Design a protein with these regions (language model features):
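Conserved phosphate/ATP/ADP-binding segment of small-molecule kinases
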Residues: 116-191
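Acidic-glycine-rich active-site phosphate/pyrophosphate-binding loop
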Residues: 1-3, 8, 19, 179-194
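Short beta-strands and strand-loop turn motifs
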Residues: 8, 73-76, 101-108, 134-143, ...
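Short pre-catalytic strand/loop immediately N-terminal to key active-site residues, enriched for Gly-Thr
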Residues: 10-15, 192-205
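Conserved N-terminal subdomain of the carbohydrate kinase-like
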Residues: 2-8, 20-107
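Short, small-residue alpha-helix embedded
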Residues: 141-142, 201-225
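Charged C-terminal helix
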Residues: 53, 226-253
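Phosphate-handling active-site elements
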Residues: 31-33, 192-193, 218-232
Length: 253
C-alpha cells in the first residue's frame, strides 16, 4: 500500500485563501500528510498584490531537505521564476514513478512578456514528466499562444497541449465562456469530457489550487485521471459554496 505523503510546490498566500494553505487543507481533508516546498511569498501593498520569489538557494535547500522523503504524489503550483522552475523540474524528474499534477500558474505574470515567455518554455518542459496539467482558460491561451473564445477553441487548445507532451489535460473555463455555467474540458489523447456546473457568486480564491491538489490526492488514493478530475470538480464546487471573504473552504464548517 502506498504511503500518504504528498508534496506541493506552492507559494504562501498572505490571506491564506490559496497557495500552500489551500494545498495543505485539501491534503488534510483527504487524510494525507502534506509537505510544502515554498516557492514564493505574497504581500498586499499600496501598489497591489505582489509576488516575492524565495531565493534560488533557499528553494534548492528545501528540495535537498526532502530528497529522502518517500512521496506518493506531487502537486506543482506557482513557480515564480525560471530558476525556481528549473529546480522543481529536476526534482520531478527524480520522481517519475508517482502521480504529478501541474497547475501552470502564469496569469499573475501576464504583464511581464519576456519573463512569461521564458517561464512558458520551461513549464512546457514539465509536460512529459507529469500526469495531468490543469491550466485555466487564460493560462491555456498563454501556453498555446492562441485566443480561446468557444468550447471548440478549448478542445483545440487541450489537444495542442496534449501534443506538446501532456498526458492528460484539463482546461478550466470557469465563467469566461458562460456567465451561468462553469465549463471545463478534459482530454486524454483520445476522448474529450465536457464537465459543467452552475457558476457561483461566492469567492473562488484558491479554487485552482484546491482543484489541482484534490486531483493529486485522488490519484494517490487510486482513482483514474478522469475520475480524479470529476471528483475534484465537485469537491471544489462545494468548497466555493463554503467560501469566506478570504477564499474557498475545503472542510465542513
Amino acid at each position: 500500500m502506498k504511503n500518504k505523503l504528498i508534496l506541493a510546490f506552492s507559494g504562501n498566500d498572505i490571506f491564506s485563501g490559496g497557495g500552500l494553505h489551500a494545498d495543505l487543507a485539501t491534503y488534510t481533508v483527504n487524510g494525507l500528510h502534506g509537505f510544502v516546498a515554498v516557492t514564493c511569498l505574497t504581500t498586499m501593498t499600496d501598489k497591489g498584490f505582489e509576488v516575492i520569489p524565495v531565493e534560488e538557494e533557499v528553494f534548492a535547500q528545501q528540495l535537498a531537505s526532502l530528497k529522502d522523503v518517500p512521496f506518493s504524489a506531487i502537486k506543482i503550483g506557482l513557480l515564480p521564476n525560471l530558476e525556481i522552475a528549473e529546480h522543481a523540474l529536476a526534482f520531478v524528474k527524480q520522481h517519475a514513478d508517482i502521480p504529478v499534477v501541474l497547475d501552470p500558474v502564469l496569469v499573475c505574470k501576464e504583464n511581464h512578456d519576456l519573463e512569461v515567455s521564458a517561464l512558458r518554455e520551461e513549464i512546457i518542459k514539465f509536460f512529459p514528466h507529469v500526469s495531468i496539467i490543469t491550466p485555466n482558460l487564460a493560462e491555456a491561451q498563454l501556453l498555446t499562444q492562441k485566443e480561446i473564445k468557444s468550447l471548440e477553441d478549448m478542445q483545440a487548445a487541450a489537444k495542442e497541449l496534449y501534443d506538446l507532451g501532456a498526458k492528460h489535460v484539463v482546461i478550466k473555463g470557469g465563467n469566461r465562456l458562460s456567465k451561468e455555467r462553469a465549463v471545463d474540458v478534459y482530454y486524454d489523447g483520445q476522448d474529450f469530457e465536457i464537465m459543467e456546473s452552475p457558476v457561483l457568486a461566492s469567492n473562488n480564491t484558491g479554487a485552482g489550487c484546491t482543484f489541482a491538489s484534490s486531483i493529486a490526492s485522488q490519484l494517490l488514493l487510486g482513482k483514474s485521471p478522469l475520475a480524479a478530475v470529476q471528483f475534484s470538480k465537485d469537491f471544489v464546487y462545494r468548497a466555493i459554496q463554503r467560501s469566506d471573504q478570504y477564499g474557498v473552504v475545503q472542510y465542513e464548517k
